[in-house]
Structures are given as structure tokens and as C-alpha cells.
Amino acid sequence: ELFTVMEPDTLLDDFILSLRIAMQGYKIAYCTQAYAIESGSADMREEQKRKVRIAAGGLQSIWRLRELLNPFRYGMLTFQYVSHRVLRWSLAPVLLFALLPLNIAILLAGGSPVCYGTILALQILFYIMGGWGYYLSTRQVKNKLLFIPYYFLFMNINVMKGVNYLRKKKGTGAWEKAKRTKTESLNQ
């Protein structure tokens, strides 16, 4: 009875449906006995398909759920939505990529060389580690230390790609399913 028909081009129908139900005042409670097994993507190219689609759906949901941005009406639900989803899909990627040129500008404008120079050096080191992590992943070499900055940058780049995906895929909620690694059945 709480189900509502989604717009046909909805990318994250389960997410939007859940929040629309919560916006009506219902609590979302998950069954503790329910479980699902989902294997990881077959490779990073397949993972990119997922991340771009999820990011596009997240951006789409910001527009579709814009009423939820009203903290006077939805209180804690608004805070949870904005802090867990909206910032990650909108502001964080833009600010991440603005940090490098802004840090350089502050340093060139006479900002503290010790403070901003150190921050800039650490930032460049982080990007180099991410690039090196990417390079190693193309060679099927796994390095946890380098994978962390690589995956962080990978996720934020895919949010930016999600903007383009959303713009190009207007009118369709269909998406290409990412290939997955094989998962063993629990019944074996």
C-alpha cells in the first residue's frame, strides 16, 4: 500500500521509494533475518559502470527529493539525507577538484609557506599515489596503500561522469548491468 509508481526514467528506484515513504512519516525498518549476497564487480571497468549510474541516480534523486531538503518539515531525516547523500553526490566532488588550484592560488598569494606548502605537498602526494594505484590496477597488481587514494579519486571522478550520464540518458531508467564475480551459493 505504500508503493508508488516511479517516474519511468528513475535510476535509483529503491532509494527514492524508501525516502518517499519516510517523507510520509513512516520509519524504514529492515528485517534482521533478511540477507542478500552480492558479489563485487568483475573489474574496475565494470565497477565504473556501477558508480557512474549510482552517481547519476544520486544527482537525479536530489532533484526528485528536493522537498526533503526542508529541515523545518523533515528535521532529522533532512540532516541524514543531506549529510549522507546530497553532499557526497554534489558538493564533495566539486570541492575535491577545486582544492588543488585553490591551494596553489593561496600559496602564490602569500599564504603561509609552511602551512599551505605542506598541505599542497601532501595533496600532490595523494594524487600521485592515486595515479600510481590506477597504474598498478591496470597491471593487475594489488597494493592496499595505493588502492585507497586511487579508489577515493575513482569514486569522485565517477560522480562527475554521472552528471554527463544523467544528461545523456534523459527519458530512460534503463542501465547496463555490470558484470560480477561469481558468488558461491549459501546452500552448498
Explain the meaning of each model-derived region.
Residues 67, 102, 171-173, 179:
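Sparse recognition of residues in long alpha-helices and their boundaries
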Residues 1-5:
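Conserved nucleotide-sugar donor-binding
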Residues 38, 88-171:
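Membrane-embedded multi-pass helical conduit in multi-pass membrane proteins
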Residues 25, 31-33, 47, 136-139, ...:
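Intrinsically disordered, low-complexity segments enriched in polar/charged residues with Gly/Pro
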Residues 8-84, 157, 161-165:
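Catalytic donor/gating beta->alpha subdomain of glycosyltransferases that bind UDP-sugars
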Residues 174-188:
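Membrane-proximal intrinsically disordered regions of secretory-pathway and membrane-system proteins
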Residues 44-49, 54, 90, 104, ...:
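Generic alpha-helical propensity signal that fires on short helical segments
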